[in-house]
Structures are given as structure tokens and as C-alpha cells.
């Protein structure tokens, strides 16, 4: 009996409890199960956008972790981010309540579906969203479980009416290799999650299994602009692989004639599929998001659309319908004719891609790039310390905050201040500064922002919440400064604040 079919019978699973339900991956699976008719609840340490959204659907949310939260539950779902000393896990073990990993629950939802699994070190969320848009434009309405909020839908997960399921496949703990996908996407492979894998070669091996575990009739889509992915593809002969890139001249799908601005990217595509005679050119594809990395993400979606015979019109329409993903180069405010961007970038390669996009736009506007970065996890900074020192070259001015721990214990010698100090000592950046308090961002913007500037706030921690409050904070600061002038009338601002 399949989980997707169980509700059609008289059988019941009881209550399914998610520990860390506010996480983007966990909230998506919980939402799908709720929409399928299952009783779902969950707990998290703090309230956030995801917990509020789930509560609005009638899902019970506990703030804080306590053993009484799972008093009447039948199953407990966890992710690798949940520690074994969590009181709810301890209680579940004591009472022998089945504990299910997030990837196992995702795999169950994907069983007997034609599933597209999107993996890679970076770009998964945007690529998943783009593929979903193409499916809908082709008249196929998939179930989607994404790692970020899709702006078109205001959610990261939704039920579809077709037999397709598109999911972001998280590689952080190797459980993604057990996902029963028909189509597998690899956007790139970089040293990441080494606290789990310990060795980069083990991580690469997991991606190899991700492809070779496909059924013989499935296929993979891989970006061979990335040298690690190219080597992996060259070593695999037992599965069909469609390749894409911008620089790789031998890729099956290549973007060229590229133009990008602050709001969009336009490019042409050359398609030369294996075992298909001739070459197809698609002209003037436009995606409403800037950046070379997003063009690569689009090529992955095009590869799926071409292989499934969506047609050129559906592909173009799908991209036209794409409204972006929350926290992926998202404009949150303007100040003094400078644009303030919120971005999820927290790995050196993501930071380089985001800043390269910002630099390209700033150059067109005769502006500068001001980067404010909140490091995420002590272990990530430790393993990639040298890479972090080198990834901010496109920032004209750089501020680095304290590390957002994300539940980790501090590591001696690994701090935001030490990163800035090493960058300065090694002359990797001559305008790198340490920012002790996020509140000081307001002063940084007021002091430095000028017309044409791109102010990029990056990180996977709480810097996003701060970025989304900047409009209010900057306005409050202006009122405070202006109120010192006795001739200044602040009444016009009162309505804005309220």
C-alpha cells in the first residue's frame, strides 16, 4: 500500500510529528502530507514564515521542543539538523515511536511517480522552480517540493494533478541517493557538508550513486562547465546523460549571445542531443532574473523540457511565468538610489556568483558593490576558510558579521573577526571590515550608499530577517536624524511607520 493511496482506504496512520517543522525542507513535506489528508503537526524553536504558513492551514505548531509535544503521535520525522539529544527524539526512542528521516518520507511520496530530483551544491532551489514552471506551461501540473519559497505560489510545496513530482534533493547527509527519481539533475559539485562526508571524494561518490541509481529508462542532466561534474559524467557509461553549459563547447545544450541586467537575462540556446541528427537553435530566451548562474539553472530546465518534448513555445512561456524564489537575489529596499538585495549565498562559490552578478549590474550603473556577509556554521567556515578569504573579490566594500551558529558549538579561532583579520593580513581584500552587530548595517548603508550601488546582504542565518526590515529601519533613522532640525515636520512619516 502506497502512502499516496492510503487515504483512499479506511486505514489511518495517526498523527505525524515533524521535529524542526519550520525548516524549508521539512515544512514542504509536511504541507504535502497535510494536503493529502494526513494529520500533521510539528515543533520548532522559533516562529518563522514557514510555521506561520502551516498554522494558517490548520497544522498544530509547538514552539520549543519538549517530550509532551509528541504525547499522541504515531510517527516522528527528523532531518540531519536535529541532534540526538533533542527531548522529542529521546521520548520517541523511549516509547518506540518510529523515527523517519526526511529523505525517507520524501522518497515515499515519490514512489510510483515520474520524479525529477534536483541536486548539486548550489542552484537546486531555483532550478527546481524553473523546471516546475516549464511543466505547468506544457500542461503538466506537477507536485513540487522545493527548498525555497516559490514566489508564484507563496509556498515551497504544492500538490499537482499530473503523475510528475519535482523535488529538491538535499545532498547534505547522503540520503538523497535513496530517492527514487526518474530524472536526476546535478547543477555542480563543490566541497560542502564536509562535517558529514569528511572527504570530498566520498561526496563525489554519492553524486555518482545518485545517477547510477536511476532506472535504465531514466536520464540525468549535468552541468559540465563544472570540472568535477564533467569528470563524473565522463566516468559514467551505464546511464543516459544530457549535458549543458556556457563554456563547455561539447555540451549538448549551450547558452550564447548572453545579455543580463538588474531584472533579467536573455540568451540563445544551441541544442545538439546525442543520437539526434542536426542542431536546433532557440533564440531570445528570457528569464526574469539576472546572473550567469541562473542562465545555467535555466539550461538544466531546458534540457528536461527538450527531452520530454515540451516544445519551444512552452519552454519560453514557462520562463516568462517564473517570478523568482525568495532570498535568491531578491530586492528588499532602496536607499539613496542604491538597491538592497537579500540573498541566500553562504558558500564561497555561491558568494562569487552572487557578487559577480551584482558587479556586472553595478558597472552598468557606474556604481559599486557593498557586500554584507553573515557566515553560517562554524564547521563550514573552518573547512572552507581559505576559499572564504578569496571569494569576495567583486565586493568594493565588504563587511563580515559574527558567525550564525545554526546550533553548532563555537570552534576556537573560527570567528567573523578572524576571517577579516586573515583577509587583511594576506591582502586578499583591502576594504574588509568586521561588523560586530547587525544593527550597525543601517549606519553602513547610510554612510556608503550612492546612486547605482548594489548592496548585497548574504547568508543563511537571520540576516534575511534583518534585510527585510531595512526599509523601516532606514526610515526610522532618517526621522531620528531629521528631527534634530526643529523646522522639520515628521508628521508625514507617522503613517508610514504605523
From Swiss-Prot:
Binding-site positions, ATP: 120-126
Pfam families, alphabetized: Mur_ligase (PF01225), Mur_ligase_C (PF02875), Mur_ligase_M (PF08245)
Keyword list, A-Z: ATP-binding, Cell cycle, Cell division, Cell shape, Cell wall biogenesis/degradation, Cytoplasm, Ligase, Nucleotide-binding, Peptidoglycan synthesis
GO molecular function: ATP binding; UDP-N-acetylmuramate-L-alanine ligase activity
EC nos: 6.3.2.8
Reactions it catalyzes: UDP-N-acetyl-alpha-D-muramate + L-alanine + ATP = UDP-N-acetyl-alpha-D-muramoyl-L-alanine + ADP + phosphate + H(+)
One GO term of the biological process aspect: regulation of cell shape
Pathway, per record: Cell wall biogenesis; peptidoglycan biosynthesis
GO cellular component, one term: cytoplasm
Domain of life: Bacteria
Subcellular location: Cytoplasm
Summary of the function given for this chain in its UniProt record: Cell wall formation.
Family indicated by similarity: Belongs to the MurCDEF family.
Name listed for the protein in its UniProt record: UDP-N-acetylmuramate--L-alanine ligase
Gene name for this UniProt entry: murC
